[in-house]
Amino acid sequence: MSNETSNQQAQMLRGTVWLTASNFISRLLGAAYIIPWYIWMGKHGAEANGLFTMGYNIYAWFLLISTAGVPVAVAKQVAKYNTKGQEEHSFAMIRGFLKFMSLLGLIFAIIMYVLSPVFANLSGGGKDLIPVMQSLSWAVLIFPSMSVIRGFFQGHNNLKPYAISQIAEQVIRVIWMLLTAYFIMKVGSGDYVEAVTQSTFAAFIGMGASLLVLVYYLWKTGLLQHIIHRPESDSQIDTKALLWDTIREAIPFIVTGSAIQLFQIIDQMTYSNVMSWFTNYTRSELLVQFSYFSANPNKITMILIAVATSIGGVGIPLLTENYVKGDLKAAGKLVQDN
């Protein structure tokens, strides 16, 4: 076995450990917070959980259509250009993609905020669901550009910043959720809708922390100055072609990644409305039922899904590197090890 192959296997192992640990910790925190949170919501626990889940399903859908496949596609392109010795193409692509994804985040955040009343009505959540969805639109503003930076690190086979940013995001998010839920329900007004709204706004707070971690590691590794300072030779690079090439790479990931979220959206848009036609259940009772069959099981199943998908994505930059070099034997060995 060559030294290069051994080095790639070590890189893949380190990346797998970092991403698996971060995904497991993040999802576990996302499942564990519900215990004190649910208790503090008192008699409105199930309704609050239902509102939270309905808001998050729409929010996750917006994240999906605005960023699905971007981290992996960016990682693949960065690995390709670096292997060819065209690092300036990587930095040019990142500069262009950060601008493009920031604009995309702004557009989708506005759309989600403005259409929240429509989505709330279609979901059967009523007016209580509107502020919950609107609070989540702020996170949509940040996430697309943040996903580009994560993909950039993945393309350099440095998954430590990616992993730590995920953990920081979840830790800060859960802290904000629990603090605001406690103070609103136990010290303040006791308005559970306000508490849920702050709990969903925590996604924005968590992403802010995650973005700070990523920027810190960009600065620490010396990559930030290469992104900020555009060399004169950059004007000779067709940035639009680089962007389109990367977007084209992301399309398969968008298609394959949308299935689970699409099924959840269909459930959300149909359950309460259909049940209200054929039963005498109130909106609150239907919200409780939705919470039982949709909200709680997903928190557990997503732990396993996140861990499995993280393992599959780690080797993509290394596979790209071997493919560009024409070393199909090394690529096959990586697939076998993965």
Regions found by a protein language model. Give the residues of each.
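Selective transmembrane-helix segments that form parts of the transport pathway or gating/packing helices
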Residues: 20, 94-109, 250, 338
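Interfacial/gating helices of multi-pass transporter permease domains
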Residues: 38-60, 192, 196-197, 241-249, ...
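Small-residue-rich midsections of specific transmembrane alpha-helices
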Residues: 53-77, 141, 294-317
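Specific pore-lining/lateral-gate transmembrane helices of multi-pass inner-membrane transport
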Residues: 80-97, 292-338
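Short membrane-interface helical motifs at transmembrane helix boundaries
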Residues: 107-125, 130
